[in-house]
From Swiss-Prot:
Belongs to the iron-sulfur cluster assembly SufBD family. It comes from Staphylococcus aureus (strain MRSA252). InterPro entries: Fe-S_cluster_assembly_SufBD, SUF_FeS_clus_asmbl_SufB, SUF_FeS_clus_asmbl_SufBD_core, SUF_FeS_clus_asmbl_SufBD_sf, SufBD_N. Disulfide bonds: none annotated. This is Iron-sulfur cluster assembly SufBD family protein SAR0880. GO terms for biological process: iron-sulfur cluster assembly.
Amino acid sequence: MAKKAPDVGDYKYGFHDDDVSIFRSERGLTENIVREISNMKNEPEWMLDFRLKSLKLFYKMPMPQWGGDLSELNFDDITYYVKPSEQAERSWDEVPEEIKRTFDKLGIPEAEQKYLAGVSAQYESEVVYHNMEKELEEKGIIFKDTDSALQENEELFKKYFASVVPAADNKFAALNSAVWSGGSFIYVPKNIKLDTPLQAYFRINSENMGQFERTLIIADEGASVHYIEGCTAPVYTTSSLHSAVVEIIVHKDAHVRYTTIQNWANNVYNLVTKRTFVYENGNMEWVDGNLGSKLTMKYPNCVLLGEGAKGSTLSIAFAGKGQVQDAGAKMIHKAPNTSSTIVSKSISKNGGKVIYRGIVHFGRKAKGARSNIECDTLILDNESTSDTIPYNEVFNDQISLEHEAKVSKVSEEQLFYLMSRGISEEEATEMIVMGFIEPFTKELPMEYAVEMNRLIKFEMEGSIG
């Protein structure tokens, strides 16, 4: 029976369920735990070797000395693997009842029926439900949970796995590489264009839980795909860790849009590595919504490797009481005539802290490259703070770089104008915030835009967490 979490008001994601897992590893990170995960999944020897090497790297690498405070993150107090069911089901009726009730509340079956080409639902460490329209399979599209792709498409999987984000990239990429479980694997063949999105939903249910999904997307030459992920967790008094890795390969003339709407509870550390390689005339779009969490550190990255490659990041971050949103983007121009755009919208309230942290790099071969950066922050009270930390590296003098940053508060004139028309101060402030984030929400499919606006309203009311 679902339990109501404390102090979540109308926040529909704040509930948690009784433990329904069929296997749960001991807390703490050891070689035995890593071997146990690999053994439970019946993985090939090369993957176990990869995991063990990654674990050694994790032990050797220092914690980041920049960004948010990670001093309270205790790796020995985390459960690294929870298996909720025997297998990923293709029929919703076959999903275990407790888990099904959770996703029913979150609207996953309804969403699939209405407007999705395929959907995947991950609960704790494993995907429990996965389905895709039959005609997409007939076109050669692969959309599977990552564990199944390793077993069923090993040659393709091995070719691309860890090619964009190696284990040595950073400490949390090494951690993910050692204990990864679940995530999505997508391959879209040459010249195949998906008109409707694929979606994955990630849910942490347990206390002191670590979720470490690994997502790998390959858009072959001339292909296009839109992938949407949603993330939530219940409210607990102790911390959980979400540390995902996302790798995307955008081949010549291909197009990928990756949309994230995360709404973690305020006890979750969200430490994610997302990167894409974009080849000739390819186009990569990150649309990134960051709400909730205790601390988010996330900087979607485009490495523009082919002439004419394009990359863009459109992000929103909302930090409330006790929250730090340290987010931004990285654009690495390695080829001529590449272009990138970063638009960052940040809101802080009730003492929350938002940080834009970005890197734009122009390599020696990036002749004719151009980048445009726009950072806007809206601070809603005197206790909240905002920082903008851009870092630009230029090794070619034939490039164009524009950067605009703006920090503002809700003006008395705006409030007076709206209130003089019979609107309350609370409603007026909400309207101003909604107008501020409109460039983000207009890029979402309608159903997601409605949900995003609702989540922002909850944040404005202080009812999340």
